[in-house]
């Protein structure tokens, strides 16, 4: 008689038959994400953004699991390797403030009071940040982006 093959066990790691065991149909957390394997062999892997944030664009890491297939009284174990590829994560820019007297110019240059400073982050390990735009449309003055991490803000009284 023909029997249907089903997945009967799932474990973390690449050594067949060993590693932390999971439950079929429930999530098993690996290093870079969570794997859910169903008895029929279908599976879903959800990458953990926080775990993969430090990857640069194109960098790859793997999450490895092993599973057991049962058909009747026969079993076999195999390894499933999931490759996680880094992407260019968006930086997180924090608001900055400055003050200037009317008619004067506020200059922020590279140094301890950069527009780009310790409160602005990019999770990619080797990314560097730069100012690409300054939001305009204020009611009290205008701003101009300068070189990396610098800006000039000239305020003038508007009628």
Predicted regions and their residues:
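Extracellular ectodomain surface segments
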Residues: 1-29, 92-149
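Acidic, turn/loop-rich segments in luminal/extracellular domains of secretory-pathway
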Residues: 21-86, 142-159
């Amino acid at each position: 008689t023909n029997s249907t093959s089903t997945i009967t066990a799932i474990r973390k790691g690449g050594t067949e038959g060993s590693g932390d065991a999971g439950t079929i149909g429930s999530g098993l957390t690996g290093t870079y994400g969570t794997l859910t394997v169903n008895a029929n062999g279908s599976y879903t892997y959800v990458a953990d953004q926080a775990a993969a944030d430090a990857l640069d664009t194109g960098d790859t890491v793997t999450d490895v699991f092993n599973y057991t297939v049962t058909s009747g009284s026969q079993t076999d174990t195999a390894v499933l390797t999931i490759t996680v590829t880094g992407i260019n994560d968006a930086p997180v820019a924090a608001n900055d403030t400055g003050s200037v007297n009317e008619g004067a110019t506020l200059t922020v240059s590279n140094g301890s009071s950069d527009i780009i400073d310790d409160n602005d982050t990019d999770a990619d390990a080797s990314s560097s940040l730069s100012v690409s735009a300054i939001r305009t449309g204020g009611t009290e003055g205008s701003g101009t982006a300068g070189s990396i991490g610098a800006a000039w803000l000239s305020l003038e009284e508007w009628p």
